[in-house]
Amino acid sequence: MNTPATQVNRLAAGMVGLGMIFDETYRPFFEAVRQQPLYDPAFGICQVDLAAVASRTGRRADAYRSAGKLGDFESFKEPDAMGQLLKARDLNFVCVATPDDRHFAASKAVLEAGKHLLVEKPSVLSLAELDELDRLARQNDVLAKVVYHKLLDPDHKKLRTLVHDGQLQHVNNGYCTLLEPKLISGEQFSEWIRGRNPGTYVAVHYIKLIDFTFGGRLVQVSCTGQRGIVGPADGDTWDSTQLRLIYRYDSGRDACFDIHTSWVTPNNFPGYVEQEVQFRFDNGVWNGHSRKRGVECTIEDQTPFNVKISINNHYNAPVVEPWGERAQRGYGIEVIERFAREVAHVEYGGPAEERSKRLEAARSLHYNDVSADRQVVAAVHAMEAILAKHAAGQPGAVVDVDAPEGGLVLRLPGVAEPEVLYSGRVAAK
């Protein structure tokens, strides 16, 4: 009889979207786990196979399959790539890495099919959509998780540890910035960039970092931005955004966080992105610069275009190990492995009759479960609405959270009647 230590279990994975994020994080994970399966004393050996992918044209899928490092997966392209993927194979989980305004439809289909879900941030763009995903996950007894890889950044882990252990006491305010190059808005994401903003795409990293690390209750959201480079100066496509969040804590005190994002940094910038955080506490200050971590490299005729001068070896680093193995490691890949381990533990981590207990234990992990994503999505929902008003000629809106009128209440200067964006309560009761 097989024991957990020798039994080989299997998870079949589906992938929706084969763009930049897939190449940087999912591809390295699936390649590595194909060579070295997951192992844990609770679930034994677990082989994870990329079984099927859905994409718009199928061209990238053909190239990856030809390379031979991901196995012989099935590839489905439009029309109805998603429907074909879910019908063709008996998948255990599906990863969704599409443009952010397409997350909901794909994620909903995955959960309706009874598959575990991992979706890129932001999970969805509205609280009503989040409610639906959470409902479907519970109804069908599967996990619904979100990729927040910055929580696994070793610097951010240390920040949270100092807060968790009470060494850094009561955050007062914070500033975060993440500036993407023009390559993102002008080339890599050009097919879906119209009508979008960099705040939803990248500020959400720091919304989650703030929400998860410091706790508290989100009470107000405001936002402004600039246009004219990616799209018309009077259009609805944004070059940069400045988001402000107000949180309130059990002490009755507030904290203010400003998050500045853009995707119009010159392509010859020394780092792939510019990113930093600063948080002030009652008894200290945390400064973290995620680009300038001490490594600079110049290579003639390579930097700063093909190779960047400042290298983030924590996120995603292709390396040759001292023992000769070529590998790709980093927190961007680790977060996907963590999800696969959670699924393996739910399905194979003990007796079948105790699966529901294991499922609830996995759902209680607030760093990535959709049930813990309410305040993050509330901020995204509010930001989207504020920027839409701004683009329509009504700047300066503020959204109050869990106000007397509703969960998300948008107020415009000079307009007496507020607009209720979401009637339910945002904060957990």
Segment roles from a protein language model:
Residues 73-96:
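A structured beta-alpha segment of the ubiquitous adenosine-cofactor-binding alpha/beta core
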Residues 150-236, 356, 395:
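Predominantly a Rossmann-like dinucleotide-binding segment in NAD(P)-dependent oxidoreductases
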Residues 252-337:
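NAD(P)-dinucleotide binding in Rossmann-like oxidoreductases
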Residues 2-7, 338-429:
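C-terminal helix-rich "cap/oligomerization" subdomain common to oxidoreductases
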Residues 2-70:
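N-terminal Rossmann-like dinucleotide-binding module
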Residues 97-98, 178:
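Glycine-rich, N-terminal phosphate-binding loop of Rossmann-like dinucleotide-binding domains
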Residues 92-93, 99-151:
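Beta-strand-loop-alpha-helix segment that lines the small-molecule cofactor/substrate pocket
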Residues 236-254, 279-282:
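Active-site beta-strand termini and strand-to-loop segments that position acidic
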